[in-house]
């Protein structure tokens, strides 16, 4: 297979200190005379030779299906009895703290917020006001000091203890999203000029991506908190981790049909007639990301297949894949294995390309 990862543009969002207004504001508000320790990084990547489903899968995993961290308040951490500003409700403050972008590797860190407004004006509480109260001493900040958390009226106070680092994935809570603003387009489908009505009324493409089978794609996204000295290293790690997660999730499906001749609840195989076989595979804790990827790859590997489809069952937290094909049970499992191996190979090559392209 040829090189999949064709090109990448990594562009950090830096403060423009050449602008006097921005320079003065940064110094006045945050005593900043140099760049923030963490920066948002826009990444644009070009891929060639893979399906729309593969790019969509990578996009989904990078955004909300890869483990990441957020700040949260432990039960009882919001000290209502010690806080005198009743307008700053717990849920309001919790949401603001949750959505502070962080770059964390140590879950033992604990922070606190102990703020008192002794002035005659409304005081803005920033993330810089969070103080570390537990865990190893930080060599490098895990969040920027510039995010607004709340406001204090004159003479009022706000006390929060036990602000800890929580691990999760974005599809459970948006604050865990590793990447934001993900979007992708197809470079090998002719588009309408942007000034034409057709561009605004439809998708912008002259042919649907569902029928044209595009193989050249551009994926864009933003990582909101990346250490300034290690931008390329962090981006490379994120992309490789996403590939490994997809490979791992696909490999877990292999275990379901390894012993297909033995009865098991996750796999139902039976003959519809003398020629066709139907397979129903139940995959726990799986999403549309893998379902769409499997469906597309199976179609590509078996163009004359009778049917392949999937359904996510949210209340059971499972995905059900259904395949009908004119083949014996053994042959159907063999074809499924070839499709699985094709997906694994694609993302193994992509992971290798990431190392080659991002130094």
Curated annotation (Swiss-Prot):
Induction: Expressed in the early phase of the viral replicative cycle. One of its GO terms (biological process) is viral transcription. Keywords: DNA-directed RNA polymerase, Early protein, Host cytoplasm, Transcription, Viral transcription, Virion. The keyword Cytoplasm does not apply. It is found in: Host cytoplasm; Virion. One of its GO terms (cellular component) is host cell cytoplasm. GO terms for molecular function: protein dimerization activity. It comes from the Viruses. In the N-terminal section; belongs to the archaeal RpoD/eukaryotic RPB3 RNA polymerase subunit family. Part of the viral DNA-directed RNA polymerase that consists of 8 polII-like subunits (RPB1, RPB2, RPB3, RPB5, RPB6, RPB7, RPB9, RPB10), a capping enzyme and a termination factor. Component of the DNA-directed RNA polymerase (RNAP) that catalyzes the transcription in the cytoplasm of viral DNA into RNA using the four ribonucleoside triphosphates as substrates. This is DNA-directed RNA polymerase RPB3-11 homolog. It comes from African swine fever virus (strain Badajoz 1971 Vero-adapted).
């Amino acid at each position: 297979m040829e090189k999949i990862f064709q090109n990448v543009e990594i562009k950090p969002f830096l403060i423009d200190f050449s602008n006097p207004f921005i320079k003065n504001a940064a110094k006045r508000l945050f005593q900043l005379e140099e760049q923030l320790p963490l920066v948002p990084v826009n990444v644009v990547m070009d891929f060639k030779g893979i399906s729309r489903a593969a790019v969509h899968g990578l996009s989904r995993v990078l955004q909300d299906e890869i483990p990441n961290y957020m700040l949260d308040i432990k039960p009882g951490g919001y000290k209502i009895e010690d806080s005198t500003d009743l307008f700053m409700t717990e849920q309001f403050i919790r949401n603001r703290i949750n959505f502070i972008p962080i770059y964390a590797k140590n879950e033992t860190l604990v922070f606190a917020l102990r703020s008192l407004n002794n002035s005659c004006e409304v005081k803005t509480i920033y993330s810089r006001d969070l103080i570390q109260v537990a865990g190893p001493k930080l060599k490098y900040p895990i969040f920027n000091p510039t995010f607004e958390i709340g406001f204090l009226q004159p003479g009022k106070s706000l006390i929060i203890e036990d602000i800890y680092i929580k691990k999760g994935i974005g599809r459970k809570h948006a604050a865990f999203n590793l990447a934001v603003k993900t979007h992708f387009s197809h470079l090998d489908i002719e588009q309408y000029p942007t000034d034409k009505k057709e561009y605004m009324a439809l998708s912008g493409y002259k042919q649907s991506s569902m029928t044209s089978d595009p193989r050249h794609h551009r994926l864009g996204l933003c990582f909101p908190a990346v250490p300034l000295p290690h931008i390329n290293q962090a981006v490379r790690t994120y992309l490789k981790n996403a590939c490994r997660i997809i490979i791992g999730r696909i490999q877990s499906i292999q275990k379901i049909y390894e012993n297909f001749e033995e009865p098991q609840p996750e796999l139902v195989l039976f003959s519809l007639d003398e020629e066709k076989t139907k397979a129903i595979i139940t995959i726990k804790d799986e999403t549309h990301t893998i379902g769409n990827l499997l469906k597309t790859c199976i179609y590509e590997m078996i163009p004359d297949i009778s049917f392949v489809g999937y359904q996510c069952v949210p209340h059971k937290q499972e995905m059900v894949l259904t395949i009908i094909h004119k083949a014996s049970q053994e042959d159907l499992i063999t074809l499924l294995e070839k499709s699985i191996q094709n997906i694994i190979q694609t993302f193994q090559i992509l992971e290798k390309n990431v190392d080659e392209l991002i130094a």
